[in-house]
Each structure stands twice: as C-alpha cells, then as structure tokens.
Amino acid sequence: IKMTDIKEIKLVDVKNNSNIINNLNSIYKLWGYEEVSPSFINTLETIKGRGIIDENQVVGIVSNNSLCLRPEMTTSIVKLSSTRLINKKRPIRLFTNGMVFDKKQTNENSFKLHEKLQSGIELIGYD
C-alpha cells in the first residue's frame, strides 16, 4: 500500500491554531498542569496498547510497521507517567499540544495521510 496524498493544516489556520494553543496553555497552567512533549514516533506495540487504537489507521514508518507515527497523545503520556514519572507524587497533571497522524484508505492500494493538531490534558492518579 502506498501513500497518495497528505492532508496538512492550511497556512491560514496556523495563526488561529497558535492563538488557540496559547490560550489553552494559559488555562492549563492556571490549573497546575505541566507541559510535556511526547515523541512523534512510537512502537506499534505501545500504540496498540489494549486494543483501543485501530491498527488500520496507524501510519507505519518502517517496512515491518514496528515503528509508527502517533495517532493520539494519551498513550504516549501514559507511557511517560509509568516510566520517567513513576516516582512523581500523584496526582500528576500534564498537558500537551502537537501533531497526530492517521491514515484513510482511498482504495485497495493507497491511503491518504492526515495530520491533525491535538491539545489536551491528562490527570493521572488521585489525592
């Protein structure tokens, strides 16, 4: 299967997105959330997790699809909190902004890559 097109964010939307992200970041910080920046690349095993992500929408970046572009942020943040932040006092308040990727099959032999901006918060644990 080959990629036939990339749906990117339009230049006219970049400034609007930047303003929205800046406003959201201010709100996140007011509520005590810390910014993290998860990797664009993950193993397919990590992304698939417990079957929440549809493997057919994941964009593999090597021939055997063992590595892929992130289709969403939550999985990467959960992995971060359970590894590098394992000893951090709970609850952990994290926020992130960035691009996520998925693919849409256009026909039997090709797909379109969709690049989307995502912003969100994760509250991990409790008091």
What name fits each language-model region?
Residues 1-127:
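TRNA-recognition modules of translation machinery and tRNA-sensing kinases, especially anticodon-binding
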